[in-house]
Amino acid sequence: MLISNTYNQHFPQLTQEQIASNATKKVICGMSGGVDSSVSAFILQQQGYQVEGLFMKNWEEDDDDDTDYCTAAADLADAQAVCDKLGIKLHKINFAAEYWDNVFEHFLTEYKAGRTPNPDILCNKEIKFKAFLEYAAEDLGADYIATGHYVRRAGDNENAKLLRGLDANKDQSYFLYTLSHKQVGQSLFPVGEIEKPIVRAIAEDLGLITAKKKDSTGICFIGERKFKDFLARYLPAQPGNIRTVDDEIIGRHDGLMYHTLGQRKGLGIGGLKNAGDEAWYVVDKDVENNELIVAQGHDHPRLFSKGLIASQLHWVDREPIRESLRCTVKTRYRQQDIPCVIEPIDDETIRVIFDEPQSAVTPGQSAVFYLGEVCLGGGIIAERI
């Protein structure tokens, strides 16, 4: 039996009754080959559950895609090594077709329309908490699935609530707002109750191969490649003019899809005559005319919005908001909470008014709402106001 003193210091000892109850429950833990899922599986073991791992392959590499292939192969090898060390079975499943149909094609459509989508949110919605959850329950007989996400849940089954992770720096509730209370109730999030350094310390105690493995960053199907190079393989770029808010053409862009609101670097328009020293920022995209709109200064009024319109709403309790609600919102990951008021337009659309104007609110991204620690849900930013 593997032992971690760090685990013993940070997790309460369960009663024999709790362990006996957990022992009747089968949990399939999604194993990514990273430290968070590795430690999640160990925690579940310590709590008495019947634990098995599952490695998902969500992307098919091209034959010339050596970098990504090696990454996927290495991740699988690490996941297998961890499961071997923990003494648990590792299942393998290929969800690449589901990923292409339900995540990647939507990603391309949104970029084509000049919006900036977040595929990780869609991946959680369509793959990890739908395809994986269904496969685990129906084919593997799971009572729960588990992942290495930094979130917590309160309550069970129909009453489950999604809470922020204990580690504010790692909280991933922003990426899970589309989950229903039912999905939350069928999921366990073991590392959501602790901070990242403790996760690594537990992995070190156990001698896991993933203990010092760096966290994966960026979009899963792009890996370490340059985003621009990857996107160019699927969407032909349409170069166009860069126009100032004063209606002056000052340069050319190589495709609207490569730029996002609030962007400062990589515009190629520095050193313009009589332009002053202030940096240029993207303040808008004119999709109809294929023009990138820019202005000088990080506090230019065109960068700011007093609110937003959101659609494609998902509330964790699946009850639409039908009256004004004061809460907080994040319009991008790791942003400080913004105090706001939600004003329902209809069951599918809301108007959100910020207490103070906010910079670089980006259509296509998600607005996610909170009441204290509870993640209420969210929607896609349709427009800024």
UniProtKB/Swiss-Prot annotation:
RNA-binding listed as a keyword: yes
Residues covered by region (Interaction with target base in tRNA): 118-120
GO cellular component, one term: cytoplasm
Interaction with tRNA (site feature) positions: 149, 365
InterPro entries named among the record's database cross-references: MnmA-like (IPR004506), MnmA-like_C (IPR046885), MnmA-like_central (IPR046884), MnmA-like_central_sf (IPR023382), Rossmann-like_a/b/a_fold (IPR014729)
One Pfam family this sequence matches: tRNA_Me_trans
Region Interaction with tRNA: start-end pairs: 170-172, 332-333
CDD domains named in the record: MnmA_TRMU-like
Disulfide bonds: 123-220
GO-annotated biological processes: tRNA wobble position uridine thiolation
Catalyzed reactions per annotation: S-sulfanyl-L-cysteinyl-[protein] + uridine(34) in tRNA + AH2 + ATP = 2-thiouridine(34) in tRNA + L-cysteinyl-[protein] + A + AMP + diphosphate + H(+)
Cell compartment(s), UniProt: Cytoplasm
EC number(s) from the headed UniProt entry: 2.8.1.13
Top-level taxon of origin: Bacteria
Active site, UniProt feature: 123, 220
GO molecular function per UniProt: ATP binding; tRNA binding; tRNA-uridine 2-sulfurtransferase activity
Residues noted as binding ATP in the record, renumbered to the chain: 30-37, 56, 148
UniProt main location, coarse: cytoplasm
Database matches in HAMAP family: tRNA_thiouridyl_MnmA (MF_00144)
Purpose of the protein: Catalyzes the 2-thiolation of uridine at the wobble position (U34) of tRNA, leading to the formation of s(2)U34.
Family note: Belongs to the MnmA/TRMU family.
Protein name: tRNA-specific 2-thiouridylase MnmA
Biological classification of the source: Bacteria, Pseudomonadati, Pseudomonadota, Gammaproteobacteria, Pasteurellales
This protein's encoding gene: mnmA
